[in-house]
């Protein structure tokens, strides 16, 4: 097997008698943007759902090649793929928590790390220094990304009150809080005006070049 960041081999997804993905193979490299192009209903979102554990493919394999190990994504559930393989995603329709603040949305992405630091115990949350330290670190990381997209001054506002383009960017940087090796974006520019699309392109170039994340 070669050492691409992502290797997909003969991926097939069937729903009863309907074949949504038929024997798809491709690879994606670190520090590059790889696009899956096709008309509505071609199965693009289904590919992402397989990669991120929402669906278990009928056939085929998906490998995430990290520097120290190769991970077979098919073996893991969705949250384990995010936690262990460091694969993150956004959705075709924005999936923020609109009634929570912008900052709270960023902290939700770091829930797994905070729970590990707590020892999965209410006593850990209340008393453990490591939990408090991790919480401070999580807020710092969240504010770093909010500064990148120019939303520091909106940190306490409800995410649902942001303009559409800012919500798109917020969803992307929320995903970046897990420090992913691979970031899957499902039609990230859908509904954006030219100015918002330009800002999105700059953000993705920064993620690709500065964070060395495959997109």
What are these regions (language model features)?
Residues 6-8, 21:
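Conserved structural motif at the start of ABC-family nucleotide-binding domains
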Residues 52:
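Helix-to-loop junction immediately C-terminal to a conserved catalytic motif
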Residues 56, 69-93, 129-136:
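ABC ATPase NBD coupling module
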Residues 179:
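Conserved catalytic motifs of ABC-family nucleotide-binding domains
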């Amino acid at each position: 097997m070669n050492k691409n960041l992502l290797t997909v081999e003969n991926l097939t997804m069937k729903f009863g008698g309907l074949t949504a993905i038929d024997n798809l193979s491709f690879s994606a490299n670190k520090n590059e943007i790889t696009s899956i192009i096709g008309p509505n209903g071609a199965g693009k979102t289904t590919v992402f759902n397989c990669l991120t554990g929402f669906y278990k493919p009928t056939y085929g394999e998906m490998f995430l090649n990290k520097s120290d190990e190769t991970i077979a994504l098919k073996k893991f559930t969705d949250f384990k793929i995010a936690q262990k393989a460091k694969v993150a995603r956004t959705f075709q329709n924005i999936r923020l928590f609109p009634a929570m603040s912008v900052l709270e949305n960023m902290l939700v992405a770091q829930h797994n790390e905070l729970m590990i630091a707590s020892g999965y115990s209410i006593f850990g949350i209340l008393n453990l220094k490591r939990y408090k330290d991790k919480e401070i670190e999580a807020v710092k990381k969240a504010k770093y990304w909010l500064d990148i997209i120019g939303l520091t001054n909106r940190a306490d506002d409800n995410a649902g009150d942001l303009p559409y383009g800012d919500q798109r960017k917020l969803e992307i940087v929320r995903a970046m809080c897990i420090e992913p090796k691979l970031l899957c974006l499902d039609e990230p520019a859908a509904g954006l005006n030219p100015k918002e699309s330009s800002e999105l392109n700059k953000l993705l170039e920064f993620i690709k070049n500065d964070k060395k994340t495959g997109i």
